[in-house]
């Protein structure tokens, strides 16, 4: 189908949950794309970086079955396309929480995957849901996965555990949150999940008249080793457009940009480049708008973009981007207890000279607290961020590893 409405996804849906609960398998069942493509990911069997895949939700006009197929799996009739969506498959491994947090910044809605063959909740189930709450993602569907590995009685007991967890520990109302039993491995009950995604997830409304702005989540060098200099392609950046539109030929600015040493001091300079190609998932487009994940081919030196070097930066129309901040004044709200640890731990107040990890948009940076009062902290960043006043920030503290302890709002 060439309908322009379906060239670009209307929204980003995060796949979140504990390690090995089946997020990547479910993404593949829904999109046909295995998102663990990084060699280390394939070897270790876990997602390390954010993986992306698109799919189109469809419905059969004959028998009303929902699916992601062009031909109805029940009666074979041609299906109607309803909505294109992008999946952000985030890592569930506890040491990779920073990557999950930066992914949450570009999620409009989320599917929380909980394996039926393990007690609920597991540590990262708690932590991922808290991350969604902090970043402000309200639309969540719970998938009770791996139901092929348990008896009907065990599945019912496990369902009750999920309901209790949602009621007692989360911002979600179990009466309004769909909980759908699925076997991603066997593609069982996917029709019910697709219907819930279409009915429950509302694509956000974007300001298309505002200046173009995009959070960069990945950056690449697409050239193979040994490519002739005359055939080299410029660097590629990928991420989520949050406002405005961009066209081939537009000039864009990237902040904070590149680090330069000048008179013994480190400074950051914005980078300017031209858009030479645009891809919505794998579809080449002339113009891109918010919704889904977009790849932008540029004239940048590919060494600048390889291995996610520009991940966490912000691209946009020149002279319209937020300021680059080396220090942040945050109004903070801490959680009552640490999420993600096996044992219960109270969140202690933030102290001066403490080192914290902050996630601002898709950027993750470390900083030292220079001043700490009850609900306000000042923090000097190791790497600057491009951010507006009023932006939300996820705050993590080192407790064996980085643990989510609360959030802040940028005051200056």
Swiss-Prot record:
Stored Gene3D superfamilies: P-loop containing nucleotide triphosphate hydrolases (3.40.50.300), Translation factors (2.40.30.10)
GO cellular component, one term: cytosol
Gene Ontology biological process: formation of translation preinitiation complex
UniProt keyword Isomerase, yes or no: no
Binding annotation for Mg(2+) 1: 24, 47
Region ranges (G5): 183-185
Region G3: start-end pairs: 89-92
Region (G1): 17-24
Database matches in CDD domains: eIF2_gamma (cd01888), eIF2_gamma_II (cd03688), eIF2_gamma_III (cd15490)
EC category: hydrolase
Record-stated family: Belongs to the TRAFAC class translation factor GTPase superfamily. Classic translation factor GTPase family. EIF2G subfamily.
UniProt function note: eIF-2 functions in the early steps of protein synthesis by forming a ternary complex with GTP and initiator tRNA.
Subunit relationships: Heterotrimer composed of an alpha, a beta and a gamma chain.
Name by which UniProt lists this protein: Translation initiation factor 2 subunit gamma
Biological source species: Methanopyrus kandleri (strain AV19 / DSM 6324 / JCM 9639 / NBRC 100938)
Organism lineage: Archaea, Methanobacteriati, Methanobacteriota, Methanomada group, Methanopyri
């Amino acid at each position: 189908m060439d309908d322009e409405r379906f060239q670009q996804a209307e929204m980003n849906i995060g796949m979140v949950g504990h390690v090995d609960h089946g997020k990547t398998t479910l993404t593949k069942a829904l999109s046909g794309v295995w998102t663990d493509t990084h060699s280390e990911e394939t070897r270790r069997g876990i997602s390390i970086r954010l993986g992306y895949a698109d799919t189109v939700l469809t419905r059969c006009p004959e028998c009303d079955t929902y699916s992601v197929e062009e031909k109805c799996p029940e009666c074979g009739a041609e299906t109607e396309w309803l909505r294109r969506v992008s999946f952000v498959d985030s890592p569930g491994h506890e040491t990779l929480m920073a990557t999950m947090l930066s992914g949450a910044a570009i999620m409009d809605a989320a599917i929380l995957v909980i394996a039926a063959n393990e007690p609920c909740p597991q540590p990262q189930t708690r932590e991922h849901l808290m991350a969604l709450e902090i970043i402000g993602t309200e639309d969540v569907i719970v998938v009770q996965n791996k139901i092929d590995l348990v008896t009907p009685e065990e599945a019912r007991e496990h369902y009750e555990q999920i309901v209790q967890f949602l009621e007692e520990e989360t911002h979600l109302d179990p009466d309004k949150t769909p909980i759908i039993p699925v076997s991603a491995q066997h593609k069982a009950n996917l029709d019910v999940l697709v219907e819930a995604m279409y009915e429950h997830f509302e694509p956000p409304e974007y300001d298309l008249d505002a200046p173009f702005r995009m959070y960069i989540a990945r950056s690449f060098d697409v050239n193979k080793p040994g490519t002739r200099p005359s055939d080299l392609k410029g660097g590629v950046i990928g991420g989520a457009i949050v406002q405005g539109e961009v066209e081939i030929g537009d000039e864009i600015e990237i902040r904070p940009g590149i680090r330069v040493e000048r008179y013994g001091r480190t400074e950051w300079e914005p980078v300017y480049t031209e858009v030479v190609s645009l891809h919505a998932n794998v579809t080449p487009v002339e113009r891109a708008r918010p919704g889904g994940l977009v790849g932008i081919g540029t004239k940048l030196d590919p060494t600048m973009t390889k291995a996610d070097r520009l991940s966490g930066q912000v691209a946009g129309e020149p002279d319209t981007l937020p300021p680059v901040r080396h220090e942040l004044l945050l109004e903070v709200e801490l959680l009552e207890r640490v999420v993600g640890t096996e044992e219960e731990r109270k969140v202690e107040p933030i102290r001066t000279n403490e080192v914290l990890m902050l996630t601002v948009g898709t950027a993750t940076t470390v900083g030292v607290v220079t001043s700490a009062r009850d609900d306000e902290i000042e923090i000097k960043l190791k790497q600057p961020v491009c951010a507006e006043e009023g932006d939300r920030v996820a705050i993590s503290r080192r407790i064996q590893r980085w643990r989510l302890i609360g959030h802040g709002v940028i005051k200056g």
